[in-house]
């Protein structure tokens, strides 16, 4: 039985980046943030992971305020600390130092009722790569349409 339940997925990341490798890590959240994420009220736009002072942080992730929350509601764009082993952090740091690589959140999922983040080690796609993918998708769609109506 699979105990991982996908909450949200960053579909734009797969289109805009080549994902070299994925790393799973925990995230430090406040109570209202947990409720908002479980209600799927978050946006991945322009979010990225960074390494500051030997700590792993998730930046620019927009988690909407919980509508039932009161004055103790969270700040929507605050940086959130990611929990990862030190060895893994050192390995990610080496990737980050290479030119062209960035760390992007790929998905949020539940593992035994704990929210986890999957961070991808990504390299940006060029415009011609994106066009090629769109061209291949349209060809596949046309072929399936022709097969369906024959």
UniProtKB/Swiss-Prot annotation:
Database matches in Gene3D superfamilies: 2.40.280.10
Location(s), subcellular: Cytoplasm
A family per Pfam: SmpB
GO terms assigned for molecular function: RNA binding
GO BP annotation list: trans-translation
UniProt KW keywords: Cytoplasm, RNA-binding
UniProt family annotation: Belongs to the SmpB family.
Function per UniProt: Required for rescue of stalled ribosomes mediated by trans-translation. Binds to transfer-messenger RNA (tmRNA), required for stable association of tmRNA with ribosomes. tmRNA and SmpB together mimic tRNA shape, replacing the anticodon stem-loop with SmpB. tmRNA is encoded by the ssrA gene; the 2 termini fold to resemble tRNA(Ala) and it encodes a 'tag peptide', a short internal open reading frame. During trans-translation Ala-aminoacylated tmRNA acts like a tRNA, entering the A-site of stalled ribosomes, displacing the stalled mRNA.
UniProt-recorded name of the protein: SsrA-binding protein
């Amino acid at each position: 039985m699979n105990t991982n339940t996908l909450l949200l997925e960053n579909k734009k990341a797969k289109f805009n980046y080549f994902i070299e490798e994925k790393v799973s890590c925990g995230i430090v959240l406040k109570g209202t943030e947990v409720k908002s994420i479980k209600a799927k009220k978050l946006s991945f736009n322009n979010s990225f992971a960074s390494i500051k002072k030997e700590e792993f942080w998730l930046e620019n992730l927009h988690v909407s305020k919980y509508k039932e929350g009161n004055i103790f509601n969270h700040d929507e764009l605050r940086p959130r600390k990611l929990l990862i082993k030190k060895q893994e952090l050192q390995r990610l740091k080496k990737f980050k130092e290479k030119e062209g690589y960035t760390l992007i959140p790929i998905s949020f999922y539940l593992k035994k009722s704990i929210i986890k983040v999957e961070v991808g080690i990504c390299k940006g796609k060029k415009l011609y790569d994106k066009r090629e993918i769109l061209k291949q998708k349209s060809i596949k769609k046309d072929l399936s349409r022709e097969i369906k109506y024959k």
